[in-house]
Amino acid sequence: MKAQEIIKSIEAEYLKSDLPTIHVGDTVRVGVRISEGGKERIQPYEGTVIAMRNGGISETITVRKIFQGVGVERVFLLHSPIIAAITVIRRGKVRRAKLYYLRDRVGKATRIRQRFDRPL
């Protein structure tokens, strides 16, 4: 058994199986676990997926939103225990794998057309 196969078999135990299918351009709501003191709560973070990186357990999505007029981007490890839930709010129709051009746009220019051929 090769080393790469051993690593994949160990990582397979920690992969989440209940993740929805996410594509670039989708609007998602990510529930992030935050522990303050002795309490734990789930904070929602909603935005547009502008990038995805595949790679087994290190699979990530970059989510962008506008907060108080400032663009905020956050990278989430999909299989991390910090992420409680991911829900797709809206499907987006884009023709790029990375939507970094949205960083330079302001206001209504950042809108993405809705896609109806994929179910939520």
Curated annotation (Swiss-Prot):
Q: List the Gene3D superfamilies hit by this protein, alphabetically.
A: 2.30.30.790
Query: Which UniProt keywords are listed?
Result: Ribonucleoprotein, Ribosomal protein
Which Gene Ontology CC terms are recorded? cytosolic large ribosomal subunit
One record GO biological process:
translation
InterPro entries given for it?
Answer: Ribosomal_bL19, Ribosomal_bL19_CS, Ribosomal_bL19_sf, Translation_prot_SH3-like_sf
What Gene Ontology terms describe what this protein does at the molecular function level?
structural constituent of ribosome
Which Pfam families does the record cross-reference, listed alphabetically?
Answer: Ribosomal_L19
- What SUPFAM superfamilies does this protein map onto? Translation proteins SH3-like domain
The entry's family comment says: Belongs to the bacterial ribosomal protein bL19 family.
Q: Which NCBIfam families match?
A: rplS_bact
* Function according to Swiss-Prot or TrEMBL: This protein is located at the 30S-50S ribosomal subunit interface and may play a role in the structure and function of the aminoacyl-tRNA binding site.
Task: Give the protein's recorded name.
Answer: Large ribosomal subunit protein bL19
Q: Which organism is it from?
A: Rippkaea orientalis (strain PCC 8801 / RF-1) (Cyanothece sp. (strain PCC 8801))
What lineage, starting at the top, does this entry show? Bacteria, Bacillati, Cyanobacteriota, Cyanophyceae, Oscillatoriophycideae
